[in-house]
């Protein structure tokens, strides 16, 4: 869960009261999940995808005040949306909620099925007897992944020796071949001699009562490695985690490391926060994160917690590194292609219907499409010949006399980057052949 500046709102809650957000799942469209947010002044926080027997379960944090509920402690609860085909979705009311006054937030976690029982592990944010904020581990069980019952003691695990009590959250659960539960917990070390003390705690238990603290999966991180995800895919093990909201991953041929840095960090970009993934049919993996809101609704302002769901499909390269693409089921239907008015400069030669060549050795060459509808899906094919600094689009560029107007999308073969407005993906290889640029 990303730490972002926010204004605190204050609530008075009696000891017997439940914290409730005005979320009515029945009113949400079953046809919309890509870029979904709940109706009204509600938002999506960290996503927790899970796959079981043909159903993709997308648990997500229901955010009602950009993390500022309950004196800034979050007031988050787990909501759920499910699908068997990624096209039609069913939205459920809160499945793990705040039921007690001491529960200040039901934080991020993970789900596993063992012996036909769903186990949801999560952190509960609370105020301890000394008035300090702590994060402690809780879990709930369910026969169907929808109706959960919290288990006692709650919390069942308060802290690991040598690690932070304030930052002890986001447990990722896996069950090994012997039936042991493994939890990977976001925290920081108390003994680090530098400020790079972020660590991924590794807990193991057979009975969910006695827990052994194993060697941490990673240490020496600049920040708490949040919202971990972990899975095996075609002989590679992946550890995914967030730092400052952005998503990073490591890969290994061994279950718990040592880890190697991938050839590219395909999940690291500023417009999607803390991505996690789950299996899907036919060996696929579908990832989900959230697009952060911005202060005052302006993209050039800073991030605030909570936003819209974003879903992508992961692909695996020959070296085990990960890439992303659009899941075909989630690409929206469109009307037939339009033919907008074209305004071109002297560097442009029209080759045929919707086909152009730009020759601009001395600077920028461009042509414009006039009166493009506000909501459009834009795709194009391009072949780059010779050294080119960059190529791309200016989106929603309403004034050609102002270079800074609009959103600049650019691919740079020279710098090996792809950028959109204020976020950049690195290690981009542009082949010497026709490539297709698409969006969804």
List each language-model region with its residue ranges:
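Bacterial Sec-dependent N-terminal signal peptides
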Residues: 1-20
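Entry beta-strands of beta-propeller and related beta-repeat scaffolds
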Residues: 55-58, 117-121, 179-183, 236-238, ...
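Extracellular glycan-recognition regions
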Residues: 21-22, 31-36, 268, 282-284, ...
């Amino acid at each position: 869960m990303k730490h972002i500046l926010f204004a605190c709102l204050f609530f008075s809650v009696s000891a017997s009261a439940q914290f409730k957000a005005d979320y009515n799942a029945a009113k949400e469209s079953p046809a919309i999940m890509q870029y979904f947010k709940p109706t009204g002044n509600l938002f999506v926080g960290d996503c927790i995808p899970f796959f079981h027997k043909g159903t993709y379960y997308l648990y997500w944090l229901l955010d009602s005040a950009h993390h500022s509920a309950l004196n800034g402690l979050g007031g988050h609860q787990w909501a759920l949306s499910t699908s068997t085909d990624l096209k039609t979705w069913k939205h459920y009311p809160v499945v793990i909620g705040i039921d007690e006054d001491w529960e200040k937030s039901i934080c991020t976690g993970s789900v596993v099925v063992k012996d036909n029982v769903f186990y949801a592990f999560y952190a509960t944010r609370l105020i301890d007897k000394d008035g300090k904020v702590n994060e402690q581990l809780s879990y709930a069980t369910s026969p169907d992944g929808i109706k959960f019952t919290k288990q006692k003691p709650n919390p069942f695990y308060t802290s690991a020796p040598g690690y932070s009590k304030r930052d002890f959250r986001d447990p990722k659960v896996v069950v090994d071949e012997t039936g042991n539960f493994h939890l990977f917990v976001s925290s920081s070390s108390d003994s680090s001699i530098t400020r790079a003390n972020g660590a991924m705690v590794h807990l193991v238990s057979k009975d969910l009562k006695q827990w052994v603290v194993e060697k941490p999966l990673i240490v020496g991180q600049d920040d708490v490695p949040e919202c971990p995800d972990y899975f095996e895919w075609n002989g590679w093990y992946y550890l995914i985690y967030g730092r400052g909201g952005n998503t990073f991953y490591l890969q290994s041929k061994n279950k718990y490391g040592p880890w190697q840095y991938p050839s590219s960090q395909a999940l690291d970009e500023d417009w999607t926060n803390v991505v996690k993934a789950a299996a899907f049919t036919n060996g696929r993996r579908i990832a989900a994160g959230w697009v952060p809101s911005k202060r005052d609704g302006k993209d050039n302002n800073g991030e605030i917690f909570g936003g819209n769901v974003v879903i992508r499909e992961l692909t695996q390269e020959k070296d085990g590194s990960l890439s992303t693409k659009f899941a075909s089921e989630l690409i929206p239907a469109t009307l037939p292609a339009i033919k907008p008015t074209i305004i071109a400069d002297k560097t442009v030669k029209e080759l045929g219907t919707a086909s152009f060549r730009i020759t601009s050795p001395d600077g920028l060459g461009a042509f414009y499409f006039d009166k493009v509808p506000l909501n459009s899906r834009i795709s194009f094919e391009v072949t780059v010949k010779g050294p080119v600094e960059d190529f791309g689009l200016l989106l929603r560029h309403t004034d050609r006399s102002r270079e800074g107007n609009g959103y600049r999308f650019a691919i740079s073969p020279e710098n090996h980057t792809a950028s959109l407005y204020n976020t950049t993906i690195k290690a981009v290889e542009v082949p010497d052949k026709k490539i297709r640029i698409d969006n969804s």
